[in-house]
């Protein structure tokens, strides 16, 4: 079973960027038994201390995908077909949302949700109101279509169960 990980994210100094880079560096040091494709932006690739791991293939995406709008378009309409082409059987999406049509392609989805801000403190989300509602909407759909959901706390789990 081939795994892909969608680590395409913001270029801004943030917890998301730090998480993505550290996660990639962690995987680079592991003795892996299966092939993993990791989708990242050019900026992340420049910052990853790339210890050549024969089982990891980085698929470098343009810096313009650091923009949330373009990232969602790519994720929903292009990423699923890239996964099919690579014969991926599982996608790990650790950035709160994922392609919602993967079920149609028989690709298992592992979603990691590291923010429950849209349900608990919606008004404290950064960005404009329309973007925040759209983000919350995509996150909710991703939760409903995923095969496995990973949350970072019991509090977050309790909030998600109530959706």
Predicted regions, residues:
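Carbohydrate transferase catalytic cores enriched for Leloir-type hexosyltransferases
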Residues: 1-163
